[in-house]
Regions:
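Flavin-dependent oxidoreductases
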Residues: 81-85, 90-162
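Residues that recognize and position ribonucleotide moieties
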Residues: 18, 69, 99, 130, ...
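Helical element adjacent to the flavin cofactor pocket in flavoenzyme catalytic cores
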Residues: 42-105, 264
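A structural signal for short hydrophobic beta-strand segments in well-ordered beta-sheet cores
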Residues: 76-79, 160-161, 244
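Core alpha/beta catalytic barrel or barrel-like domain that forms the active/cofactor pocket
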Residues: 74, 167-168
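Beta-strand segments within the central parallel beta-sheet cores of soluble alpha/beta enzyme folds
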Residues: 73-78, 131, 210-212, 285-287
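C-terminal accessory subdomains/tails of enzymes that are appended
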Residues: 1-3, 8, 13-36, 41, ...
Length: 451
């Protein structure tokens, strides 16, 4: 009933939910262990094929194309309100240069740092945030289909197996923390591996040695007041929705919490609030983001088919190159077709197994605001999620990427990323313990680092 109601709330846009018997489950996904299963539900929904950072940058790039001014690696040092509006003291953290900016309205959407920023600027609100830590582990591909598998863990919280190209992304956890700066612990890792091994019929159980990379972060959850009294609440019952407060006298807007899937609605709400504070906005034509019109898509795939784009690939892939370029870049993919026509090697992978071709790298260097190698590997692409630390470090293509992205600073940016500290942290993620006695290093074998 819950799945059907949720489907109806979405205007029945996708296929209707289906109730599955244990046999129906294993017919669709043989890897699922049905020994203790009473049944399951097949539900159609959207998921992010690349990663959340790439999804968000799609909005940033579209906003830039529509005339927005955007900057990254800028820190707000302080801001004061004067008779003519706000005066912000800012710092370019990469160049170490301070500068000043004026603004009629300030919007605090700093996620887990929202309360600290409000305190710093003297803003009083009815809401605040508490933080929930979540992690994901990337392992070799588990299920063959492009399906997200969802299970209840031993604490009755949902966790997922999400396809990510040649890998599977397992997670997430949901634990209260008091700081936004978190990392994957042995306990986090062991919990997820235990849960997934108990619910899948794998040839060999997953161990720390199978971990290719990890993700870790916090969710800012909105609460009333200062969050007092929530310590003993069911953590998963706290709302994932957002709250917005507007200080009309100071022309200051604060956004608490929220989910990525609701980002357009939150943006529209903020735009209306900005308008009520006296700023005149351009009329929303609802065409600056999202997929271009169907006729444009049809023309792109026609051109890709005529130039035999997908046959240029020398390696097997989990999606065709034409599909991937259109999904990631939309209108901007037409220029990539032209570049590949001129030089077919532009359709080659920059790093084997990364599913990221040379023409994307050239485009990223020109248009994707890449300042550090971490930007490129984790935020504009998913290379650092689907390939191990060692694979990336030893790949010839990483040096080509650094030269193209950073020019004279190529070696500097390479050295910033490949540090002993980073190698130690990713090696620790794969270290054995008593829970996994069959792990190679537990028996004295060698263990390569992964990231």
């Amino acid at each position: 009933l819950g799945a059907t109601a949720y489907w109806m709330i979405g205007n029945a846009f996708t296929k209707p939910p289906a109730l599955l018997s244990p046999r129906g489950i294993v017919a669709r996904e043989p890897v699922v262990d049905i020994d203790t299963a009473l049944g399951g539900i097949e539900y159609s929904d959207a998921y992010i094929v690349d990663n959340d950072a790439r999804f968000v940058f799609g909005f940033v790039r579209s906003a830039l194309n529509s005339g927005a001014a955007v900057a990254n690696y800028v820190e707000l040092l302080d801001a004061t309100r004067g008779p003519d509006g706000w005066v912000a003291q800012l710092r370019d953290t990469d160049a170490g240069r301070d500068f000043q900016l004026t603004a009629k309205v300030v919007i605090n959407c700093a996620g887990p740092f929202v309360d600290g920023l409000n305190d710093k600027l003297g803003i009083t609100t009815k809401h605040s945030i508490v933080m929930s830590k979540g992690i994901h582990l990337l392992v070799p591909r588990i299920a063959g289909q492009e399906r997200v598998l969802a299970f209840y863990d031993d604490t009755e919280r949902l966790f997922y197996v999400i396809p990510m190209g040649p890998r599977s992304c397992i997670g997430t956890t949901d634990d209260r923390v008091d700081t936004a700066y978190t990392e994957v612990t042995d306990g986090d890792r062991d919990f997820l591996l235990d849960q997934i091994n108990a619910r899948l019929q794998l040839d060999e159980p997953l161990t720390p040695d199978d971990i290719i990379s990890s993700r870790c972060g916090v969710r800012p959850l909105v609460v009333e007041g200062g969050g007092e009294g929530t310590e003993n609440e069911d953590w998963t019952s706290l709302s994932r929705k957002h709250a917005m407060e507007v200080d009309k006298s100071k022309k200051f807007i604060t956004i608490f919490g929220g989910k990525l899937t609701d980002c357009v609605n939150v943006g529209n709400e903020v735009a209306r609030a900005v308008g009520r504070l006296g700023l005149k906005l351009e009329r929303d034509r609802k065409s600056w983001y999202g997929e271009p019109p169907k006729a444009t898509k049809t023309e792109f795939f026609r051109q890709a088919r005529l130039m035999h784009l997908d046959k240029l690939r020398q390696r097997a892939s989990f999606e065709t190159l034409s599909t991937r370029l259109w999904r990631r870049y939309g209108l901007r993919a037409f220029a990539m077709l032209e570049a590949i026509r001129d030089d077919p090697t532009m359709a080659n992978d920059i790093i084997a197994g990364a599913e990221y071709v040379r023409v994307e790298l050239y485009y990223a260097a020109q248009t994707e605001m890449i300042t550090t190698l971490d930007d490129f590997l984790r935020r504009r692409s998913k290379i650092a999620l689907v390939l191990s630390y060692e694979e990336i470090r030893e790949a010839e293509g990483i040096h080509e990427a650094c030269r193209l992205l950073f020019g004279d600073e190529a070696q500097k940016r390479y050295d910033e990323y490949f540090t002993p500290e980073r190698e130690a942290s990713v090696t620790k993620l794969r270290e054995p313990d008593a829970k996994f006695p069959g792990h190679p290093q537990a028996q004295g074998g060698g263990l390569p680092a992964a990231g």
